Amino acid sequence: MTKNLLVELGLEELPAYVVTPSEKQLGEKMAAFLKGKRLSFEAIQTFSTPRRLAVRVTGLSDKQSDLTEDFKGPAKKIALDSDGNFTKAAQGFVRGKGLTVEDIEFREIKGEEYVYVTKEEIGQAVEAIVPGIVDVLKSLTFPVSMHWAGNSFEYIRPVHTLTVLLDEQEFDLDFLDIKGSRVSRGHRFLGKETKIQSALSYEEDLRKQFVIADPCEREQMIVDQIKEIEAKHDVRIEIDADLLNEVLNLVEYPTAFMGSFDAKYLEVPEEVLVTSMKEHQRYFVVRDQDGKLLPNFISVRNGNAERLKNVIKGNEKVLVARLEDGEFFWREDQKLVISDLVEKLNNVTFHEKIGSLREHMIRTGQITVLLAEKADLSVDETVDLARAAAIYKFDLLTGMVGEFDELQGIMGEKYTLLAGETPAVAAAIREHYMPTSAEGELPESKVGAVLAIADKLDTILSFFSVGLIPSGSNDPYALRRATQGVVRILDAFGWHIAMDELIDSLYALKFDSLTYENKAEVMDFIKARVDKMMGSTPKDIKEAVLAGSNFVVADMLEAASALVEVSKEEDFKPSVESLSRAFNLAEKAEGVATVDSALFENDQEKALAEAVETLVLSGPASQQLKQLFALSPVIDAFFENTMVMAEDQAVRQNRLAILSQLTKKAAKFACFNQINTK
């Protein structure tokens, strides 16, 4: 016989960004708890609103499965003394299992007998296990937590109710300072307290109190309501996925509506209007069928349609205040002079240990000079890059960015165009912030890409130089994201810029404001980001590529992919083993690896030396790998017919020199002795 279990935790309003992860975490931990308690079930469904987290388990077995476990103890020679009596070792072993020496039996394993005991545990009724659910609730983790009412414990928000039902049976469990009951809370304004009748009636009991407990249902309600407004007004409404997820976690009973604002505000840049609506007011943007922004917005109310006109007016009033600010800053910022703002950046701190933003820009400008040549920019692109690097942070001192910091770079582009700068300079100022997330959009222009790399590199090197190095999950200055951005941009543009050589060049630069330090740590940090970009590539292949001598990001990623692609082929294992043996022996070479053909003693070493001399890795990574694997028979023949570590020192070093030259070329692809072929 199966049962249905419901657990609901009623809290004060949760931050929207916490709701969905917490709901998922509750479901996962409940499933793990039940499996750990040997309770089978058919399905788990989770629920969440801003004021509750809940989980329902259906088809839950009414008792634990019985458990039979065998435990291996000490060897028989240790378990018995010379008189055949059980020793203290044997007695202690069985006592620890809650058994006696009478339960001991001996089993033979690989010719030797050992103590074994079998312990049987009869499964308990599910009712006896339910109280342990409190530990599941206590185990939930949150990005922030708080104390309340003088209590010593912490939780994401104060807890008001706990409901635990097994079908209709109520459990009055104690959790924090709350005693469980079947009472739950309805909508804050439209509903009231209600009793949940059973685990299966949960959604309907709450629906009567204007609470839609299932977030998927709330999401669909919002989407359907927006689609209805679209059809009614013949408009297009942008349903941004992130905004939708946030809004559904702000409401328990959603009602979407359309509001409007004066069309005069459409003269302000669209990005300002969209930011005001989406980021600050959580409104959806409305466009006509041609994609043109309209003076309307969509909001979602936490409630029904009663007095909706008053709600619309209130939302319009709040938005207009934001738009007034945007219009004012747009008008006033155009009176500013870019060069004056750049000069004022001398008084804006980048970081107290590093210096001003202006000093950061100067260092970035010097880095762009190095990168421009390596990225093979044209003369015009180089000129645009120099101009962009000289002014690219100026918009941080505009009123608009001061009010709407999400628009940094975006407003820089617009103001530079108004000031007569070239489109390339303007675009680079916008693009230098890219990417803004792990999977964020990358710069499209070469000028913007180089400026983005230079800005991020100085940021990384500057913070490392003053000892502000990320550790563990702690990365307050987003240096991992900056490094990931550098790596992604280099890969996307296919620039064959060796990172080790570039970093060496940067450390050779001289600045009045700062001296770069901790180069080794920087290199390890960059390699860790390349490692991350390799994704699910096997660890040994990652290590082989990262240990290689080629630190061109695009080449490294391509090499890793090529190795993974051929790793299941028949010749992979023997080819890698041949190269690996060469790598291991080459480490014994001394001095400069010079090969003297006069010291050859057989045709096989001559053949390998000639093959290595003519080896030039070229083309895509898959082709280079074929070139290396083609040497496998020649390498094998060399090892089969040649004693590398010959007694004659000159002959030995000559043979090691052949292998050293081979591995030097192969290491541009990967260090093959790092690959596991077992």
Swiss-Prot record:
**Primary localization class, coarse:** cytoplasm
Instruction: Give the PROSITE patterns listed for this entry.
Output: AA_TRNA_LIGASE_II_GLYAB
What is the protein's name according to its record?
A: Glycine--tRNA ligase beta subunit
Q: Does the keyword NADP apply?
A: no
The places in or outside the cell where this protein is found are: Cytoplasm
Which InterPro entries did the record assign?
DALR_anticod-bd, Gly-tRNA-synth_bsu, Gly-tRNA-synth_heterodimer
Record's subunit section: Tetramer of two alpha and two beta subunits.
Tell me the enzyme class.
ligase
This enzyme catalyses: tRNA(Gly) + glycine + ATP = glycyl-tRNA(Gly) + AMP + diphosphate
**What biological-process GO terms show up in the record?**
arginyl-tRNA aminoacylation; glycyl-tRNA aminoacylation
| EC assignment | 6.1.1.14
UniProt record similarity statement:
Belongs to the class-II aminoacyl-tRNA synthetase family.
Naming one, the record's GO cellular component terms include: cytosol
| Alphabetic keyword roster | Aminoacyl-tRNA synthetase, ATP-binding, Cytoplasm, Ligase, Nucleotide-binding, Protein biosynthesis
Source organism's superkingdom? Bacteria
The GO terms describing molecular function are: arginine-tRNA ligase activity; ATP binding; glycine-tRNA ligase activity
